[in-house]
Amino acid sequence: MENSGLLALPLNAATIVPEGAILLALLSSLLVDLAGEKTASRWVPPICYAGLGSALILLASQWNSTLSPSFLGAFLADNLAIAFRAIIATSTLFSLMISWRYVERSGAPMGEYAAILLAATLGAMFLCGSTDLVSIFVSLETLSVSSYLLAGYMKQDARSSEAALKYLLVGSATAAVFLYGASLLYGLTGGSTNLDAVALALQSSDTPVAALALVFVLATVAFKIAAVPFHQWTPDVYEGAPTPIVAFLSVGSKTAGFALALRLLVGCFESFDIQWKFLFSLLAILSMVLGNIVALSQTSMKRMLAYSSIGQAGFVMIGLVCGTEDGFAAMILYLATYLFMNMGAFACVILFSIRTGSDLIADYAGLYQKDPLVTIGLSLCLLSLGGIPPMLGFFGKIYLFFAGWADHQYLLVVTGLITSVVSIYYYISVIRMMVVIEPKEASDVVKSYAAVNWNIPGLNPLRVALLVCVIVTGIGGIFSNPLFQWANSAVAGTPILQKVIVTALGTTGTIS
């Protein structure tokens, strides 16, 4: 009877047409790559742009559409899934634009590289709308395995291979932990993997088994978003992996992790609301404090941005813990703003690395004299990450802090404010080094800085990505209110979030 009920559900394949466009670009990239590197370098970029651009247009056309489960109840294209999938697709688009020159210099096959990155994108996008434990695991592993391959893609670099091995070992352990937690949830439901059935079973189950399943699920989510103490892989992987891949992991993979948190923790563990929010609050505080304090002592730009991303995850977790409409909306808004400011920062780091081969913060000394564009772009993105007004990041943080304060999350908000000040210190230290130091005090690397030449193949897409990210980061604060309304619309069009919000309002009304 259960099988006949499942078969009665529609496939509704139209909901994953955006992913279909990306899959078509993936297969086309592999086919073009067979024709030789010269042909691939000419055709792979436009193929990827067409696939990702089509996916974004198709996602926009699905906004506020009628909700119906897809693939026997394993996927749901609600507004939450659409918003997160759009952020991930955009992060991949920027990652590819800042990748081409980097890949050409390394001599790696361009079509193969693009195909693996698009595969990771597919895994992340499917994860955002998965409503079944099996589809969640398959999506999670698609994202993870592709990420392992990308982290170790520069085989001639020992640090890249080391990063891939560490990422693989920790990621494999996390996959085992999730599988064990999923098996416990499967047992509690009496044999169903659908998240609605899991949520229903957990409402009437306060057993230690359910609590253990919560711990395993929370550990999986914490690993994907690089929250303390599940962050150990992050600095080493960020430092050793190719920089464009680090940019994708810091935005695309993290966004998928927060989508997973909303689907599982908010959607399924409503009866354990107090417990998981307490644990997540603890992780948020640890992430904000450790991420920003350890970043102070870093000498590598990529390691500094790695610890910065740990702290940024802590800020986003404030919105998740709130469990209110404003909290969820602020969380989505901040992830969208983080996309532009972080991608802009990594674009500048890649440009500097291409021209100097260095990743040391000290080597940025006096850069303004030789490369004003990289200096101004990196400065604006770092100021935005620090939450300096009127940058886009300031409005993202202020919405998060307002939502936290309104929900009486005073400790989280105060911790966020203090650690934001700490982050401003190390961001401004980099800016001061680039701008204030006299030409005679510039680093040896900057003194021998190569002349800026944008006619080199692969640099023009990087420049476009850099300019777009910097412009949006610099003046995007003007449009923060429409962005917040978009985020509110995403929350309003997501049934699992509305259910939690209504329940919270009812509880508040009862208490008052």
From Swiss-Prot:
Where's it mainly located?
plastid
Membrane-spanning residues where?
6-26, 43-63, 80-100, 107-127, 133-153, 168-188, 210-230, 242-262, 276-296, 304-324, 332-352, 376-396, 411-431, 464-484
Instruction: Report the InterPro entries cross-referenced here.
Output: NADH-Q_OxRdtase_suN/2 (IPR010096), ND/Mrp_TM (IPR001750)
- Gene Ontology molecular functions: NADH dehydrogenase (ubiquinone) activity; NADH:ubiquinone reductase (non-electrogenic) activity; quinone binding
Catalytic class of the enzyme: translocase
Q: Its topology with respect to the membrane?
A: Multi-pass membrane protein
Source taxon at top rank: Eukaryota
| Subcellular location(s) per record | Plastid, Organellar chromatophore thylakoid membrane
EC number(s) reported in the record: 7.1.1.-
Q: Reaction catalysed by this chain?
A: a plastoquinone + NADH + (n+1) H(+)(in) = a plastoquinol + NAD(+) + n H(+)(out); a plastoquinone + NADPH + (n+1) H(+)(in) = a plastoquinol + NADP(+) + n H(+)(out)
Provide one Gene Ontology cellular component. organellar chromatophore thylakoid membrane
Q: Keyword check for Methyltransferase, yes or no.
A: no
Its family remark reads: Belongs to the complex I subunit 2 family.
Describe the task this protein carries out: NDH-1 shuttles electrons from an unknown electron donor, via FMN and iron-sulfur (Fe-S) centers, to quinones in the respiratory and/or the photosynthetic chain. The immediate electron acceptor for the enzyme in this species is believed to be plastoquinone. Couples the redox reaction to proton translocation, and thus conserves the redox energy in a proton gradient. Cyanobacterial NDH-1 also plays a role in inorganic carbon-concentration.
Q: How does it assemble?
A: NDH-1 can be composed of about 15 different subunits; different subcomplexes with different compositions have been identified which probably have different functions.
| Record's protein name | NAD(P)H-quinone oxidoreductase subunit 2, organellar chromatophore
Q: Which species does the entry assign this protein to?
A: Paulinella chromatophora
- Originating gene: ndhB
